[in-house]
Amino acid sequence: IFFTKIKHAAICIGQIKTPKPREETYKKLKAAGFNLPTFFAKSAYVSKNAKIDEGTIILNKCVVNSNTKIGKCCIINTSSVIEHDVNIKSFCHISTSVTINGSCTIGEKSFVGSGSVLRESIRLKNKSFIKMKSSIKKSNIK
């Protein structure tokens, strides 16, 4: 479907209502044999102990601390802080200036709006939608 000598591709599709276009594009690119590298902005800090899966983009001034796992094709947007031992599943969009405190789990295909703060150990179910400037003190999954 593309040039035969190109082996890498990047997906630059955001998310507010649904990650479906990004997920479908990912599946098509993988089926065509493409690798999807992970991108880190020069001003981002990513711990050497963090595990970041393919196709994820970590933008300017983000912090990703130790033992954090971020799944496939996620967007960690400008100035967000992802603390220790956080698990962000695939196809999530963490908007600008979000703080996710330690040991939280963000379910697959979730959206966390700008300026939101999640207390430590929060668990969000798949396809969660968190409005901007939310203060999350309780999990929405047991």
Label each PLM-derived region with a short phrase.
Residues I1-A41, Y45:
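Phosphate-bearing ligand-interacting subdomains
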Residues T38-K142:
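Structural signal for interior beta-strand "rungs" in well-ordered beta-sheet cores
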